[in-house]
Amino acid sequence: MRASQYLIATQKETPADAEVISHKLMLRAGLIRKMASGLYNWLPLGLRVLRKVENIVRQEMDKSGAQEVLMPVVQPAEIWQESGRWQQYGPELLRINDRHDRAFCLGPTHEEVITDLIRNEVKSYKQLPLNFYQIQTKFRDEVRPRFGVMRAREFLMKDAYSFHISQESLQETYDVMHRTYCNIFDRIGLQYRPVLADTGSIGGSASHEFHVLADSGEDDIAFSSDSDFAANVELAEALAPAKQTPGSSGAEEKHTPSQKSIEEVAAFLSVTPAQTLKTLIVLGETEDEGPAPLVALVLRGDHSLNDIKVSKLEGVADPLTFAPEERIKNELGAEVGSLGPIGLKITVIADRAAAACADFVCGANKTDYHLINANWDKEASYSRVEDLRNVVVGDPSPCGKGTIEIKRGIEVGHIFQLGTKYSAAMKATVLDENGKDVTMTMGCYGIGVSRIVASAIEQNHDDNGIIWPDAIAPFQLAIVPINMHKSDAVKEACETLYDQCQTAGIDVLLMDEPKARLGAMLADVELVGIPHRVVIGDRGLEQGNIEYKGRRDAESQEVAAASLFEFLREKIAP
């Protein structure tokens, strides 16, 4: 490609509304332009990157045996009502009516569409298993789109759906998809972690997310220092520590006026937050129309409550709901900041770490008073012990190897074992070997294609711009001439190299704009992130050398002009 015939819309200034580095650089490098909140135009440079990611995804999905289909973005309300998600999905589902006042939605996902398709096309267990995928535009009406294409309302996604006669068959395909995703991210050149995850609104049983590790990530990923274990913090198990041995003779009540938070109480009593317990009051489950019972959750003061874990506990309302402060004071006799597991007449669930504490500080269930040197089975008691908290750095890994480390991650892929959540609701059945109707078991597998582009930038950039992994760079090589339109020798050398690269299948950009300054061209090449570049000028040609620099290299090097093409062919991965 010749720069003189190509739109390279770079900018010197960073747009004020761009928050994360990928958003800033995608705008400055001329990859995207904002059209409206959460909606972006992809410019030629950006689209080249997007298509390269898409091609890698397609190639690996085809290798896995999945079959490509294409389903409509606009979906009829009936199939969403049939699955039960028309109301469940909430305002993120953009609902529209056509001229005949028939209800539709813009698809944020395609479980209903594919289930409707396959229940009408597949009739026998002999046709299974089957796995279908598409690379299609999705729309989710995010309440606050941000971070550019990282969290846009419209985005490009690869979604796949598999159908099975048994759980064993689903597990086989699930494992194939796990390996396929690893192959995809390896080929793109990303540092990533597959992690155990929650199934969320999609539903189902087993689930793994694939996270690109980056400081700007929205999710905390817990992983072992000595094994492959990794999980979203919301799902990582916090093991029980060794029980502490009480050393005091008995608890003592202390007046703690106006000390509400753990930090305030700990400082006032000259202890660390780890030596305190906090008691949180939530609503329990109820089967009648009366008020839900109160449930006390007790954690160590320096630990944070894990909403996902707690909402799955027997006896606790789902979704997790904190009790009103007025009700707490009326029924338990103390304000929130002074509560403790002391003589409570309600269910008390202690976290594993809290249950192992001794000589701790806790609320005395008397406003503005706390106990010091309290102990279980003496002053305090609990109904049962559960895992209630988020893991922290240094915790023992639940796999039994190493300790927990935590990094931020950007979710770029997610695989689910759906089971029969959708197939049962939509009566997607096949005849088994005995001629009986059996509900198909399903899996689904998503990759954020456009999000991968932003994630790659978050992981690969410097002060000068983007540093693309070779596999998805818009161009692999930039030829930067000095006075090409004034020197026949420079022009001939540039054109010869350009032709050689095109013949060899190397994506090459010739910076042939007649009025472009050398400094501006080099700055654009670095900003756009082209992995390899050469500078060709009269002086170098006279000496028989060409200047080469890799985007990740600190310094340039001289390469013999006669062997330049062979040098580049070895440098640039096919």
Swiss-Prot record:
One GO term describing the cellular component: cytosol
InterPro entries: aa-tRNA-synt_IIb, aa-tRNA-synth_II, aa-tRNA-synth_II/BPL/LPL, Anticodon-bd, Anticodon-bd_dom_sf, Pro-tRNA-ligase_IIa, Pro-tRNA-synth_IIa_bac-type, Pro-tRNA-Synthase_IIa_type1
The reaction(s) this protein catalyses: tRNA(Pro) + L-proline + ATP = L-prolyl-tRNA(Pro) + AMP + diphosphate
SUPFAM superfamilies hit by this protein: Class II aaRS ABD-related (SSF52954), Class II aaRS and biotin synthetases (SSF55681), YbaK/ProRS associated domain (SSF55826)
An annotated GO BP: prolyl-tRNA aminoacylation
Top-level taxon of origin: Bacteria
Main location: cytoplasm
Protein's UniProt keywords contain ATP-binding: yes
Subcellular location as annotated: Cytoplasm
EC number in record: 6.1.1.15
Disulfide bonding pattern of the chain: none
Keywords from the UniProt entry: Aminoacyl-tRNA synthetase, ATP-binding, Cytoplasm, Ligase, Nucleotide-binding, Protein biosynthesis
NADP found in the keyword field: no
Molecular function, one GO term: aminoacyl-tRNA deacylase activity
Free-text domain note: Consists of three domains: the N-terminal catalytic domain, the editing domain and the C-terminal anticodon-binding domain.
Subunit structure and binding partners: Homodimer.
Annotated function: Catalyzes the attachment of proline to tRNA(Pro) in a two-step reaction: proline is first activated by ATP to form Pro-AMP and then transferred to the acceptor end of tRNA(Pro). As ProRS can inadvertently accommodate and process non-cognate amino acids such as alanine and cysteine, to avoid such errors it has two additional distinct editing activities against alanine. One activity is designated as 'pretransfer' editing and involves the tRNA(Pro)-independent hydrolysis of activated Ala-AMP.
Similarity section: Belongs to the class-II aminoacyl-tRNA synthetase family. ProS type 1 subfamily.
Protein name, per record: Proline--tRNA ligase
Organism, as annotated: Teredinibacter turnerae (strain ATCC 39867 / T7901)
